[in-house]
Design a protein with these regions (language model features):
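Cyclophilin-like peptidyl-prolyl cis-trans isomerases
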Residues: 1-125
């Protein structure tokens, strides 16, 4: 999904926006009892989920613009530090009535910098 001035979403293994990895992980955000101070500002990555707070799997979204109403309700986990022009380009693409891009959009390269911290695998539920 691509919603200009809000976010771009990816990570569906089927490419439909409805798929997942076959498991779910615990939602790491304050309304679910997990301290997570990262705010949903432009460039922040967060886990997409269904209504169930523990339903995230492989889908994620990147904030195109600030969305403070998501703070504490979704598991923000990273931030775009280079290449925000690519996020902006995707956010400006033409979409259909379901917010799906008219032309396929792909992230060609992504690097995750953990700054030497070894994070445990998320708890599956």
């Amino acid at each position: 999904r691509v919603i200009r001035n809000f976010m771009i979403q990816g990570g569906c293994p089927e490419g439909t926006g409805m798929g997942g990895p076959g498991y779910a992980i615990k939602g790491e955000f304050s309304q679910n009892g997990f301290r997570n101070p990262l705010k949903h500002t432009a460039g922040v990555l967060s886990m997409a989920r269904a209504m169930n707070p523990d339903s995230a799997g492989s889908q994620f979204f990147i904030m195109h613009k600030d969305a403070p109403h998501l703070d504490g309700s979704y598991a923000a986990f990273g931030k775009v530090t280079e290449g925000m022009d690519g996020v902006n380009r995707i956010a400006e693409c033409r979409t259909d009535y379901s917010d799906r891009p008219m032309k396929e959009q792909k992230i060609k390269k992504m690097t995750v910098e953990t700054f030497g911290v070894d994070y445990p695998e998320p708890k599956k539920v």
